Regions:
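Ca2+-coordinating acidic residues in Ca2+-binding motifs
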Residues: 101, 226, 410
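Conserved C-terminal "switch" segment of AAA+ ATPases
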Residues: 134, 147, 161-226, 237, ...
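Short, conserved phosphate/pyrophosphate- and ester-handling motifs at nucleotide-, phospho-/glycolipid
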Residues: 10, 199, 256
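Short pre-active-site segment immediately N-terminal to the catalytic Zn-binding motif
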Residues: 240-253
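Soluble catalytic regions of large protease machineries
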Residues: 46, 250-254, 261-467
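Short active-site segment of divalent metal-dependent hydrolases/proteases
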Residues: 103, 258-260
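Walker A/P-loop NTP-binding motif of AAA+ ATPase domains
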Residues: 2-192
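Terminal C-lobe "cap" of eukaryotic-type protein kinase domains
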Residues: 230-234
Length: 467
């Protein structure tokens, strides 16, 4: 049992911190090996990830006298406090100086890197070097710190904290639920797959809000309805009630979201954590899905066009409304892949120097033509996937209209039933589907036809540019 056991997750980080604590407690062993204690430890990462908690556990595990410095005074008094903290730690060595939220020590103006607060910290670190004083600092954004402060020699060991992984999140949720009354209806897999893992603090807040909701309703325990409602509200800004709209509008929204979901599941099976028709901060028109597994840029582009493809396939001759964000997302995915990875060939890579911020006119014309061609191709793939998964699409749409929100277990149950009726296809199978029927590609070699189409688009764009 050690002080770090109270921190859930971060196994690799805790091992590294335990090693440093062992060095502080048993310097002679390491010195005999010719190893010296690193100069300083800097923990950094987004707010709420547990940097301060880990630093406090480090202090507790080390057992050394510790002086904590955080910005709680005016500038002059604070600078004096920094100097006094290092001087006091030096007289009580071996000891620790903890600089909490060090990136907030100075104002965030253009000259904050040269602020006297950071100069005082640097002077203090240099003054206690090799005196038995160990310095720990936490920061949200180390880019706000002077490079001279965060360099090796002042902070030899830098540890960046990331948002919890899926397994970390499940461990954190399980830990916090131990202190709460929980109904048997809570499905841990559904819960972890629908949540975003932004920080440990956010996960704790969500579980507490679920407990508040259950207590207010005078329930005997937190149930899945409480969990889902709080996650949708806290993480997605979703309203609890559907807006008053016609059945036809609800059905179209459901079909649109089902299109995204089915394409996503076909390309990346088991990737959709949940789907909902409720309006959210990100989509005030209503409807969104959460993918709990990462997709490639090309897959993301196809998924983004799935909603439009579903509606326009069902309502032939109609152009789906409210798809501008989806199209913009698909375009961005195509451009990212083309610019960074050369997915459309080297001719579309911007190889100009970084000092030139504007893309050349010729390159821009070629890029726009290629993006348009790729949009058509990916739209065709989305329609092909939906045609192959017609039963799955129909049943997801009906379930969304009825339940408004589908969890991971709901989606997989529907998928399992649909597969028995009409086996769902994978991305590879979709590429063999008769895209010729949609895009007039020769069925024997659709990829070559696509390349020829892109070349014709590029030639047409070049002719327009030169005319």
């Amino acid at each position: 049992m050690n002080a770090f056991d109270k921190v859930i997750g971060y196994k690799a980080t805790k091992r590294e911190l335990l090693q440093l604590c062992d060095m502080l407690r048993n310097r002679e062993i390491y010195e005999e090996m010719g190893a010296r204690l690193p100069h300083g430890l800097l923990l950094y990462g987004d707010p709420g990830l547990g940097k301060t908690l880990l630093a406090r556990c480090f202090v507790e595990e080390s057992g050394l006298h510790t002086i904590t410095v955080r910005r709680d005074k005016g500038s002059d008094a604070f600078i004096d406090g920094i100097t006094q903290a290092f001087a006091s730690a030096k007289t009580k060595a071996p000891s620790i100086v903890l600089l909490d939220d060090m990136d907030k020590f100075a104002n965030e103006d253009d000259t904050h890197c040269d602020a006297p607060e950071y100069a005082a910290v640097q002077a203090g670190i240099d003054d206690v070097k090799d005196t038995g004083v160990f310095v720990i600092a936490t920061a949200n954004d180390i880019r706000k710190l002077p490079s001279s402060l965060r360099r090796s020699g002042r902070f030899d060991r830098k540890i960046g904290l990331q948002a919890p992984t899926a397994s970390d999140a499940e461990e954190i949720i399980t830990h916090y639920l131990k202190t709460k009354q929980v109904s048997d209806s809570v499905n841990m897999e559904d819960l972890t797959r629908m949540m975003r893992y932004n920080s440990c603090a956010e996960l704790e807040t969500i579980l507490n809000e679920a407990a508040v909701r259950a207590a207010f309703a005078r329930k005997t325990g937190i149930d899945m309805e409480d969990m889902v409602s709080v996650v949708l509200k806290q993480q997605y800004g979703a309203q609890e009630d559907m807006p008053r709209v016609s059945d036809e509008v609800i059905e179209k929204v459901a079909l649109h979201e089902a299109g995204h979901l089915v394409v996503c599941e076909a390309l990346c099976p088991g990737s959709v954590g949940f789907a909902s028709l409720l309006p959210s901060d990100e989509n005030r028109c209503g409807g969104f899905i959460h993918c709990c597994k990462g997709a490639s840029d090309s897959q993301s582009a196809i998924i983004a066009l799935g909603g439009k493809a579903a509606v326009e396939t069902r309502y032939a001759g109609q152009v789906a409304e409210g798809c501008s964000d989806d199209i913009a997302c698909a375009v961005n995915c195509i451009r990212e892949a083309a610019a960074k990875e050369g997915t459309l060939g080297f001719s579309l890579l911007n190889v100009e120097s970084d000092s030139s911020s504007d893309m050349s006119e010729s390159l821009n014309a070629r890029s726009e033509a290629a993006v348009q061609a790729e949009l058509e191709r990916y739209y065709g793939k989305a329609r092909a996937l939906l045609a192959q998964n017609e039963v799955f699409l129909k049943e997801i749409t009906e379930a969304l209209v009825m339940k408004k929100t589908l969890l991971y277990s709901d989606i997989q149950a529907i998928r399992g039933t649909a597969v028995k009726k009409n086996p769902a296809v994978t991305c590879e199978a979709a590429s063999r589907y008769d895209a010729a029927e949609i895009e007039n590609f020769p069925p024997e070699d659709p990829e070559e036809a696509m390349r020829q189409k892109i070349m014709r688009k590029l030639e047409e764009a070049e002719r327009r540019r030169c005319s």
